[in-house]
UniProtKB/Swiss-Prot annotation:
Name of this protein: Uncharacterized protein MJ0756
Upper classification of the organism: Archaea, Methanobacteriati, Methanobacteriota, Methanomada group, Methanococci
Keywords: Signal
UniProt keyword annotation of Signal present: yes
Signal peptide start and end residues: 1-19
Entry keyword annotation includes Signal: yes
Native source organism of the sequence: Methanocaldococcus jannaschii (strain ATCC 43067 / DSM 2661 / JAL-1 / JCM 10045 / NBRC 100440) (Methanococcus jannaschii)
Amino acid sequence: MKKLLMVILGIALIGMAYAFPPWMAYQTQTTENTDINPVDILKTAEVVQHTTPFGYNLSHLEIDGKIVGVLWKDVDLSKLEVGEPFNTPFGEKYPLYYDRELVGFIFTNHPASHYGYGMRGGYGCHCHCGCCCWQQ
């Protein structure tokens, strides 16, 4: 009887974990946060070139050593247009356009302390978005 009770309790706990996954809170996130102004982020960000361990060259927008965006083309930041934000499991993204061509994104409202050490064996990225795991 105890074993059956333990099995039922275990199934109930597993069911609760899958019924309320940790990222569910961020699926109802709104884009009405007036504290975030992507144009101000563009004004203060600097473009930093990184090379991944696989040899890919990436251009990131960084503020105080933290990645706040990505660029796929070498463009003048003052000529970028910011599009309408959209939500992802990893936070909001603002598309960046240069001459009506998508050239990158600004990342905002990341759901966790994204850039700290101590997660996943010492790397900063623990949310699987891949934007900072390799740069430690």
